[in-house]
Structure formats: structure tokens, C-alpha cells
Curated annotation (Swiss-Prot):
Keywords in alphabetical order: Amino-acid biosynthesis, Arginine biosynthesis, ATP-binding, Cytoplasm, Ligase, Nucleotide-binding
Root EC class: ligase
Major localisation: cytoplasm
Entry protein name: Argininosuccinate synthase
Gene symbol of the encoding locus: argG
GO BP field: argininosuccinate metabolic process; L-arginine biosynthetic process; urea cycle
Residues that bind L-aspartate: 119, 123-124
GO CC, alphabetical: cytoplasm
Family: Belongs to the argininosuccinate synthase family. Type 1 subfamily.
Source species, domain of life: Archaea
Positions annotated to bind ATP: 9-17, 117
MF GO annotations: argininosuccinate synthase activity; ATP binding
Length: 397
């Protein structure tokens, strides 16, 4: 009888390490593990590979997807000002790409199943499985932690029985996910929304209280809606994001602590570090205010909100997402310019912006010239609010 093979999305954490052994013990699969590089630390790629091999996988793959993540995902998110309840979607944005790469590998090696370590309460099960079913509908999906209804304590006990190194303990079980666009921190004492996030949770952002005492000015240049240079220095896609992370992070900008509405309907307390994302999206929105018309801005705000909602829910391949991209891309054709931001001890302010495509005309708004004859406005003003005036007259009869 031919061995059945499962491709496991493997991070090296407790959930996926338990999945690796459970696939062998409970499901009778041989395991091929894979990590997709979307900008996580080098150790977060090296250690899982070593750990997977020690735990007996047939083979481990590391797939470099950083460039694709930056260009095809992050840049799209910037153009759409993608924020879900104030969160720049760092984890949510990476999941479709990771799922695509895993599905492609599974098809390439003829795997019988694809497995992940998602729980039944989180968002990632929706994000992974919607993409996998789109890209590889013929391949079975197995989620051992969810399907066996395991608690964190039960996982730790199972790991001890199987000799799996435990990366967390019961006193400090923070779950951290990191990629090029940001870090997410959840679990443990953070589940109590009244407890302030401990300082040790943060890695990318300096505590605003001890950030440097001088204001730092940053100029970001955009071409067709995407950042191409910072402070006059040109960067490729990956490094422009890294530079933004560095500059905002060292000034304490980019910490997000929210109560978030999950796909399932649960509310969860989430902490994020996303300095570059906050800086770039804030600057991009400032440029749009300069360039787009009022009607475009009002409509695009609705588009941006829906775009973020689709990403958060894992609906990357939803036809509407492609439709929204078409609108967003059209608005970004003239989104060229420079935005100046001031960073200081956790605060971010836009203090300047310029564009050759600006609809802002200084000569027309200035109080010091007569390019626009004020007397010609009288007729327009007379009928402004006409319906409200009629309504009031009827109400007062």
C-alpha cells in the first residue's frame, strides 16, 4: 500500500509541531513540512527546518515569497489603505500567499492532504482553507488541533509525551506571528482586556517614553500609489518597507491595541506592531487627499473598507476583490508625489505634501488674489440647503 503524504504548513510552534506527530499517529500520514518566507526573522525559518527534521519529516521546504508578498500583496494594501478596525492586516495579508504556495507544492509532489495548525476559534482556518479549496480542491484538508478539539494544555501534554520541544509555557503563552508588514501578539494574559500589554511583547517599536527627544522628519515618495523612496533614497519593494519599519519603530510609532471582531463573530483582544504600515498608509492617505476629487475620496473610503474586510475574512480570490482592485488601480494612476511626516515619541503627523497631480490650487484658495471672483458665488449660495429650508417651512405650518 502506497504511503499517504500530507503537506504541513509548519512554523515550529506548539500547534504545528503537535500536528506533525498527530498526522503520523492519528491519521497515518507521512509528513512533508513547509515554511513560506514572507519576511519573518531568519531564525524563524532555520529553527523550524531543524526541528521538523528531528521530528521525522520526509522533507522540509522553505519557499522564499518575500518579493511577491511585498509587490502583489503589501503594495495593493497600501493603495487601498487597507485597515481592518485600525489593524493593517499584516497576518491576514500573508495567509493567502502562504496557502497558495503550500497548495502549489502539494500538487507538485502529488500529496494526498494539506494540513495546518489552526484552531477552531481563530481566523486563519478561514484564510487558509478558502484559498486551498480554490487552488487545490481535490486535496483533503486536515486541521488536527481543531478537528480533535484540543486545548492548549492538552497540546502541551501531548508534546511532552512525544518528546516535542515546547516553545511556550503556561505562564507566558504569547502567540507571535511576524512578517515583513508587521507583528501580531496575542494570548496569555493579553486575553484580559484590562491588562496593559507587557513591554517584553514589543520588538519593533521603542517605548515612546524613552524614544529620542528630537523630532524626526521623513519624506516618502510615491509613484502610482506605491512607495519608491524615503528621504530621497530609492528602495526596492522589500527594503522600502523595512526602512519605513525602522524609521517609525525607533520613534515609538506603530503600536496597535484593539478589541477585534473575528470572522467567527468572537471578539478578541489583539496587539500589533506595524510601524512601517502605519507610516506608509497614513502618508498615502494624505497624498490621496491632495490628488483625488471629493467624490473619489468618499467612494474610495467605502472601497478601502470593503477591501480590508475581504482580506481579513480570507476572501483573497473573491471576484469582488479583483473588481475593487480595478477601481483602486485607476485612482492610483496619478498618485505621484511626496509626503512629509513628523515622528516624535509615538506620534505621527503629516506636515507636508506635494504632487504635480494635485487638485489643490494655492492661487485659487488664497485670500490674497482675485483669480476667482467671489461675487459669482452669490447665486449658488442662495440655493444651498434648499431642501432643508423647504422641510423646515412645512414642519412649522
Amino acid at each position: 500500500m502506497q504511503e499517504k503524504i500530507a503537506v504541513l504548513a509548519y512554523s515550529g510552534g506548539l500547534d504545528t509541531s503537535c500536528c506533525l506527530k498527530l498526522l503520523e499517529d492519528k491519521y497515518n500520514y507521512k509528513v512533508v513540512s513547509v515554511a513560506v518566507d514572507v519576511g519573518q526573522p531568519e531564525d524563524d525559518l532555520k529553527e523550524p527546518e531543524e526541528k521538523a527534521k528531528k521530528l521525522g519529516v520526509l522533507k522540509h521546504y522553505t519557499i522564499d515569497a518575500k518579493e511577491e508578498f511585498a509587490v502583489d500583496y503589501i503594495f495593493r494594501a497600501i493603495k487601498a489603505n487597507a485597515l481592518y478596525e485600525g489593524y493593517p492586516l499584516s497576518t491576514a495579508l500573508a495567509r493567502p500567499l502562504i496557502a497558495i504556495k503550500i497548495a502549489e507544492l502539494a500538487k507538485e509532489i502529488g500529496a494526498d492532504a494539506i494540513s495546518h495548525g489552526c484552531t477552531g476559534k481563530g481566523n486563519d482556518q478561514f484564510r487558509f482553507e478558502s484559498v486551498i479549496r480554490t487552488k487545490a480542491p481535490e486535496i483533503e484538508i486536515i486541521a488536527p488541533v481543531r478537528d480533535l478539539n484540543l486545548t492548549r494544555t492538552e497540546e502541551i501534554q501531548y508534546a511532552k509525551e512525544k518528546g516535542i520541544p515546547i516553545p511556550v509555557d503556561l505562564e507566558k503563552p504569547f502567540s507571535i506571528d511576524e512578517n515583513l508588514w508587521g507583528r501580531s501578539i496575542e494570548g496569555g494574559i493579553l486575553e484580559n482586556p484590562m491588562i496593559e500589554t507587557p513591554k517584553e511583547c514589543f520588538a519593533w517599536t521603542v517605548d515612546p517614553k524613552i524614544a529620542k527627544d528630537e523630532e524626526e522628519y521623513v519624506e516618502i515618495e510615491f509613484k502610482a500609489g506605491v512607495p519608491v523612496a524615503i528621504n530621497g533614497q530609492k528602495f526596492d519593494a522589500i527594503n522600502v518597507i523595512k526602512e519605513a519599519n525602522k524609521l517609525a519603530g525607533r520613534n515609538g510609532v506603530g503600536r496597535v491595541d484593539i478589541i477585534e471582531d473575528r470572522v467567527l463573530g468572537l471578539k478578541s483582544r489583539e496587539n500589533y506592531e506595524c510601524p512601517g504600515a502605519i507610516l506608509l498608509i497614513t502618508a498615502h492617505k494624505a497624498l490621496e487627499q491632495l490628488v483625488l476629487s471629493r467624490e473619489e475620496l468618499v467612494f474610495k473610503e467605502m472601497v478601502d473598507s470593503k477591501y480590508a474586510d475581504l482580506i481579513y475574512k480570507g476572501l483573497w480570490h473573491e471576484p469582488l476583490r479583483h473588481d475593487l482592485d480595478a477601481f483602486v488601480d485607476k485612482t492610483q494612476e496619478r498618485m505621484n508625489g511626496i509626503v512629509r511626516a513628523k515622528l516624535y515619541k509615538g506620534s505621527l503627523r503629516i506636515v507636508g505634501r506635494e504632487s504635480e497631480c494635485a487638485l489643490y490650487q494655492e492661487n485659487m484658495v488664497s485670500f490674497e488674489n482675485k483669480d476667482m471672483d467671489q461675487r459669482e458665488i452669490v447665486g449658488m449660495v442662495k440655493f444651498h440647503g434648499l431642501q432643508a429650508a423647504i422641510f423646515e417651512s412645512l414642519r412649522n405650518k
